[in-house]
């Protein structure tokens, strides 16, 4: 279940390769 690159559910991967919340 790789949402946006292995981020926690509810998080999205940014161009930096980090994960930030999208809620």
From Swiss-Prot:
Keywords: Cytokine, Disulfide bond
Disulphides: 7-19
Pfam families noted in UniProt: GBP_PSP
InterPro entries: GBP_PSP (IPR003463)
Official protein name in the record: Paralytic peptide 2
Family to which the UniProt record says this protein belongs: Belongs to the GBP/PSP1/paralytic peptide family.
Source organism per UniProt: Spodoptera exigua
Lineage: superkingdom: Eukaryota
Role: Causes rapid, rigid paralysis when injected into Lepidopteran larvae. The physiological role may be to reduce hemolymph loss following injury and promote wound healing.
Alphabetized GO MF terms: cytokine activity
One GO location term (cellular component): extracellular space
Keyword Coiled coil attached: no
Tissues and organs where the protein is expressed, per its UniProt entry: Hemolymph.
């Amino acid at each position: 279940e790789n949402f946006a690159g292995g981020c926690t559910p509810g998080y999205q991967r940014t161009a930096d390769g980090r994960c930030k919340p999208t809620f």
